[in-house]
């Protein structure tokens, strides 16, 4: 069951329309953060995940040829509580991708949305960026 959960996380990582038309290749992975006896931190491929564990989702893209800018969007699996993303310009959604904005500017009812409310992440890739990477930190619910 834990392995199926890990596979589901990887499958949900990226969903972006028309990436095939742009000549973009995406690779993605799910990693778990481990602490060493000396307090050091390292990540390793996630073979199984347990509640409370910190995970790192990594999405890398590469475009073989120049082209137009495009948007990559990533669903955050419900079983993960989003913490942060490595791209400052990334936008988040708290309503399944219907509306987008910066965390701290979105409202969930009468309160400002928190990282745990995030359901999706998206970012723009410009024509001058032939390759790149985004990492997402989350906690297993």
Feature locations, PLM:
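Sec-dependent N-terminal signal peptides
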Residues: 4-13
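N-terminal signal peptide c-region/cleavage motif recognized by signal peptidases
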Residues: 15-17
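Exported/extracytosolic protein signature
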Residues: 19-141
